[in-house]
Amino acid sequence: EMIDLASPPVGRVENINDIVALVKSKIDKQQLAPGTWVLGFGYDDSLLEEKRHPNRDDLDRASLDHPVMLTHVSGHLATVNSAALQQQNIDQNTSNPPGGVVRRRPGSREPNGVMEETAMGLFSRNLLAPIDDEKFEHLVRQTIKRYVSYGITTIQDGGANMSDIERLRVSAKRESYAADVVVFPWSNFFDDDQLAAIEAESSYTNGLRLGGVKFGLDGSPQGRTAFLSQPYNEGPPGAAPDYRAYPTYPAEKFNPKIAQLIERGIPTLVHANGDAAIDMLING
């Protein structure tokens, strides 16, 4: 279970001390054993009093014995403590992964704890305990019920994975969903065979259909990771004056894949926030 780190009016987190206190409280109340991961979601640096991301030094005040990973409200960044860095062997010798950045302490290559885009993948795989099929179905149906209570009758998941899509099919076959659910698997990591196996569905079966695929070409304006054609007025800490961010998925991989999908008539969603990323999409 993740810690809710939302700021007002959604939540109650107003500063970094509040975040540290929530992490410490979870560890103490649940008597978590050393080495147990502590996860949170929803902090917004722009709404914190300090107007910055919590870094490893901040989170070390919560624990030096428990790896901590907190995800930004945009989903495009995360911050971790020293225990998390040590457990994953991330240090000054770690290179930035393609499409991501490990932020560093000023004047050094030592990670400061903040991870941009694909750098989150250095940590975020297999941290959550697997959800069994019964709980998965319960959570899905409770979520649909909440949407329907607000009058929303079509729900889209633009970041699905194929294993969860298969579980959704089994669940919907057991009992039709109360709203239409359309899923688009996140396809940045699909190889050619996986992409060729996708068959988009034009109609719903038991309230579910696979709508096509989705790619992500860049990050978010909030995180200063949206790919721009002109430099940011204010980039992330330590960024060069000509900082424009970067693509999270290279054109040389995207172009042949989108051409294949268009030829096959497969609907394709593309995350492209910055104007340079939009140009990548148009030119592709």
Question: Model segments located where?
Answer:
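Short, small/polar residue-rich loop motifs at catalytic or cofactor-binding pockets
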Residues: V73, L208-R209
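Divalent metal-binding segments
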Residues: E1-A196, F215-M280
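Short amphipathic
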Residues: R209-F215
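Polar interaction faces of repeat-based domains
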Residues: N283
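Acidic (Asp/Glu)-rich catalytic clusters
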Residues: A172-E175, I198-L208
